[in-house]
Amino acid sequence: FKTPITFLVITEGWCGDAAQILPVIQKIVELNSNFNLKIVLRDEHPELMSCFLTNGGKAIPKVILYNEATDSIDADWGPRPSVATKMVADYKALHGVLDPEFKEHLQVWYNKDKGETIINDFLTLLEPKIILA
């Protein structure tokens, strides 16, 4: 990347998904000197959060790719990796809510995945920008 990109993350300290996702995002940012990371708390920035709702909800973490050269948003991602998003949707379709058993299952998935899906999601998200850069 030749253009400075800020990875703006909206999150909260209590977010279980963020605990799994943020270390991977940090490593991605470290790979390119034009990447920057900024973290803001959802509850302290309601106006910002309202611009990046997921199905009408304030789901976090939400990662916004802000292009500093064009002063524009290139993309946003979150609140979960693609595989985890499907797992959540499928479970909610069958059970209506995410119970403690599912939440444990999701954490086991995160541990086994070791950030691979997050990396692949971001490669897919960033690939068009790399080609155009």
Task: Write out the residue ranges for each language-model feature.
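Residue-level detector of beta-strand face positions
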Residues: 62-64
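Thiol-based oxidoreductase modules, predominantly thioredoxin-like and allied folds used
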Residues: 8-11, 25, 34-48, 66
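Non-globular targeting/processing and membrane-anchoring segments
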Residues: 1-3, 31-34, 50-59, 68, ...
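A glycine-rich, hydrophobic loop/mini-helix early in the fold
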Residues: 1-28
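Short, solvent-exposed secondary-structure capping/transition elements
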Residues: 18-19, 31-37
